[in-house]
Amino acid sequence: MAYTQINPATGKKFRLISAPVVKKDAKALVTGKPVYTDDLAPKDCLIVKVLRSPYAHALIEEIDCKVASRVPGIECILTWKDVPQKRFTMAGQTYPEPSPYDRLILDQRVRFVGDAVAIIAGETEAAVDHAMRLIKVKYQVLEPVLDMHDSKDGKILVHPEDNWKALCNVGADNKRNLCASGGETHGDLEAAFAGCSHIVEKTYHTKANQQAMMETFRAFTYMDVYGRLNVVASTQVPFHVRRILAHALDVSKSRIRVIKPRIGGGFGAKQTVV
């Protein structure tokens, strides 16, 4: 491979063929310099944690944060009442995304065990954990969808809301529990089967899986002197994060800057808004 460079002494262009080229960040990596998101986070950052749902499907009828908000060191507690009601997709895909706009930052309806209920920010992890235990939530527990074979056109809607939308024609329909649907055929399938001496039909199931990168999902944010929200995140898609975050917060993209430091692996899992 050939590389065209400029000689700083003469100003003339020259090419490197079959010669090693030093990576700009190589020395920092091998000497353990701070290059990853967690290395760069200021030591006085607020700690942010999320209160999670214990139910697979429920509506939040009441949420009381009064006592929790009085815990020393707690700066902010947010519920579904405090965030913009603009649905978005977490998928880091080029606009218009094929994935439906089905999420809110916080929603009154929770759809799986572990879904977000409240966001707590405080000066210390101990304060945040204490406040989280003091938040009182009253749920209307609903019947969940537990079997994908029963979900389509079933009696339980995962997303019954009217502001759900799909930007692309991928066969999505929230009133049928479909995030996408479609099919494709080539040639005469029945004729091909007729010419086979044996036909084997099987159904195979695999468990959910996830990439195992060494650096887990992490981010920190701060406001700069221009009033912009700066997001430093271990993401593979900084420009998608900027666009999707601006939409979710209902602000202009010009008010958000996303910085992607060196990431410790991603393998596609970090192609999302984290």
Predicted segments, located by residue:
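Predominantly extracellular/luminal regions of secreted and cell-surface proteins
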Residues: I77, G183-A192
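Thiamine diphosphate
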Residues: R243, G264-V274
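Beta-strand segments within the central parallel beta-sheet cores of soluble alpha/beta enzyme folds
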Residues: W80, R255-P261
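Acidic, glycine-rich active-site loops and adjacent beta-strand->loop/helix elements
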Residues: V83-P84, T235-P238, P261-G266
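Flexible, low-hydrophobicity surface segments
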Residues: M1-G171, I199
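Short, surface-exposed connector motifs at secondary-structure boundaries
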Residues: I47, R111-F112, Y222-N230, G264
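A glycine- and small-aliphatic-rich helix-loop capping segment at beta-alpha/alpha-beta transitions
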Residues: Y95-P96, A246-D250, T272-V274
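Conserved beta-alpha junction segments in alpha/beta enzyme cores
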Residues: D188-L249
